[in-house]
Every structure is written in C-alpha cells, then in structure tokens.
Amino acid sequence: MGLLAYLLVILLILNVFFAAVTVFLERRDTSATWAWLLVLTFVPIFGFIIYLIFGRKLSGKKIFDWKGQEKIGIQESTANQIEMIRQKEFPFSDPNVKKHRDLIYLLLVNDGAILTQDNEVELFIDGHEKFDALIADIEKAKDHIHLIYYIFHSDELGNRLMRVLERKAAEGLNVKIIYDAMGSRTTKKSFFRTFEKNGGLVRPFFPSKLPLINFRLNYRNHRKLAIIDGDVGYIGGFNIGDEYLGRSKKFGYWRDTHLRVHGKAVYAMQTRFIMDWNSASSTHKIDYKARYFPTFHGKGHTSMQIVSSGPDSEWQQIKNGYIKMINAAKKTIYLQSPYFIPDASLLEAIKIAALSGVDVRVMIPNKPDHAFVYRATTNYAGELMETGAKIFIYDNGFIHAKTLVVDGEIASVGTANMDFRSFRLNFEVNAFIYEKKMVQKLEDAFLEDILKSYQLTPELYAKRSLWIKFKEAVSRLLSPIL
C-alpha cells in the first residue's frame, strides 16, 4: 500500500472520528448535527477540515470576565429587580411596561438585563442621518469613546470617521475600537496606524492564531455599539462602510434600523463593551470606574432592556425574548430581517400566532446578500405563507433591519437576525423596548416600508423554476450550519 493510500485511510478514519464527535460528544441542535453529518459523509476528504474551522463548538473556557462589576452594583441591581418583580413590588413607569412583566422578568433572569425607564431614544433608518449624529456626538466627547463594529471598512465613510477618532485620541481622550477579525478582514492594520500613534487603542475580536486558518472562524462578534462619555449610546444594524450609505451598486439604498440612546440603558451598553474589550485585549484592561458610568438625571420616558447573547451561553437569550414576544401577540407581529432562517421553536411560535388569527407580516430582501442564505430564507417564507402569514419583499434597495414589533406595544431592535447563526454562533446585542411612542415609530417605519415592497403570494411563489426549488431545498438542508 502506497503513501497516498495510507493518507487516504487516515483521513477517512479522522472523518469517522469527527462524525462520532458531532453525534455523540458535542451538545448541539439535532438539525445542526444532521447537517454536519451530511458534510462529513459526502465530503470525506475535506469534511473534517471544514468541521475543524466551522463546526467545533467553543471550549468551556470562560470568554467574558464579570469580575469588577460589583463596583458599580450591577449584580445587586439585577437581583433587586428580580426580587421586586417576583414580589410584584417593582415601580413600573406606566401600565404598558407592567403589562409585559413576564418578558422583562425572563430577560432579567436569562441575561441579567436590567430594565431602565428614563431613556431618551432617537430612531434612525437612514445611514447618512445615523453617522452624522454619531460623528457629531464623537466631536463633542470629553472623556472616552468606545466603538465595537462587526465591519469597519477603510473606505470614504470609514476614513471620515477615523479622522475624527484620530483627532480625539490626539486630544488625550480614551478612544478604543473593537472590530471583528472576519467581518473586517479586508481592512488592513495600517488603516489604524495613525489612530494608534495618536494614543488610540484597537483590537480585533477572535483573530486567527495560525496563518490562513482560524479555528474560531465560525464565531463572530456581530455587535454594533458606540458609547460616548458613558452618556450616549448607539445600538442597531448599521456597520461602518460606504454600502451602508447606499453607495453600493449591488445593493443600492440601504435600509437599516439604529437607535441613539441617552439614559441608564447606556450603562448596559458600556458594560457589554468592557466585557468584549477585556476578552479581546490581553493588555490595557478596562476597570469598572465611575468615569465610565456617569450619574444620569434622566428626562426620558422610554423603558428598555439591553440583551446580549452568544455561543458562550446555552440560553439563546435574544431568541427566547423573540419567542416570548411572539407568544404574547394578540393583534400584530411585524418582523424584518435580511436572513429569515428560524429554528423549529421560533418557526412554530410564528406559525401558531398566524394560525391563531394574529396579523403576521414578515419582510425580507429582494436580492441575495449570501446566495445560500437567501434561498433558505425564501424557502422558510414559502412555508410560513401556508399558515396565513404575509410575506413582503422589500423592493427599494436592501433591507438589513433586524426589527420585531408586536401589537404596537413592544419591540426589539439590534444586531440579531432571525437565523441559526445569530442565535447560536454570533455574539449579538439587542434593545427590547416597552414604550408605546417609540414602538409606534418603529411600527410606522415598517408600514412605510410595506409601501416600498411587493407581497409574495402563493401564486407567485409557485412559479419558481425547478432549479430555484432545488437550490432552496439544498440551502434549507444546510441552513443550520450556514
């Protein structure tokens, strides 16, 4: 037997071993298990390499350090809120917030997401307005600027923002940037050179430790947060790049949703940034000092919780929040996501709502961002139509918003898509909102988007070609690992 034959046998044995690990040792969703078995079975030579890069679960090693949070009373505040809500003694700001006590309690217990009720919130659905506001706030910063973005491109918008950050760092402000190593893979390190020379600090999240191979490639930090002086925070779907200003020929106008927050909810955003920074950086760790958590004298009336989720937890906090919202629906469910690949639990919740007479409307893009993901999205949308849910195809560019609005009373806005990746593989962050005026603005934006969309009817869906149907079937089969 030649050397090549020996190598082939070794590879096949490794393939069987990884298949066994997938089935018997790693705790994962059944659908994902079967999807990986298909890959390992039908790609026997390279299947285990693909699995090593994309399939392995994160180790049990602690990724985020909660040490030091007692200095600002986070655990104490969380425990107090849990107990007061359990004892029905919590001073809710208005009846609508109190009405959704069960959802608030779930997110408190599941994620430690403290409810804050004094927030002033501004809604952005256009990238130009969002980045103009963000840069204006950065220009006014006096102490620190903390940014975390999945994508930070070195294009016109990226350079415009970077020049401001370089100047603020040179002024002596504490300026820190986290970018995702995969999402920002085309951005060269030299882009940050002047920023670092001026005193700014930048860290990639989960960079490759080996040339060409990153064994944590599948686990990405998809969060988008900006915190200025601990006083103002931004959360939502916009990354940093020209395409988010509608400058891409492929996508055209970019429709997204982002929030500017002034109030105690910024504390939660700050805490999230500190934990992510201390995970990404081996030096210049951030301590929980008072400078990062200034005293607020809130004038706002928006109640909200900032909820994080990621592969470091088995609880899928944001998805559980979505399901709780959907199960509570009595009249309407309006949902926007560029990728609609729900797992069985979320899909069943939406189906039950539609079959119960709730007006369910789901909005998806009219063009693919990722080909396989898009075909899986249209397949799930087609299945949902069978329950009476209405599917709308956004036809005015590209819809990237991740928004869920229920009964005009509660809403969620953030970075988490309605897909397996956001629920199980990505590090995400969402705002759950309970104030009717803010929720109404989100509902109005959705209804305005419907005027720029067309409805996908069963008749139109049935006209798909045999090739499209085949691509949908394959994409859905692989959807748990896309």
From Swiss-Prot:
Reactions performed catalytically: 2 a 1,2-diacyl-sn-glycero-3-phospho-(1'-sn-glycerol) = a cardiolipin + glycerol
Gene Ontology biological process terms from the UniProt entry: cardiolipin biosynthetic process
Membrane topology term: Multi-pass membrane protein
PROSITE patterns: PLD
GO CC terms in record: plasma membrane
SMART domains the record matches: PLDc
Superkingdom as given in the UniProt entry: Bacteria
Principal location: membrane
Active site: H222, K224, D229, H400, K402, D407
Family per record: Belongs to the phospholipase D family. Cardiolipin synthase subfamily.
NCBIfam families attached to this UniProt entry: bac_cardiolipin
Identification of the protein by name: Cardiolipin synthase
Species, as recorded: Listeria innocua serovar 6a (strain ATCC BAA-680 / CLIP 11262)
Lineage: Bacteria, Bacillati, Bacillota, Bacilli, Bacillales
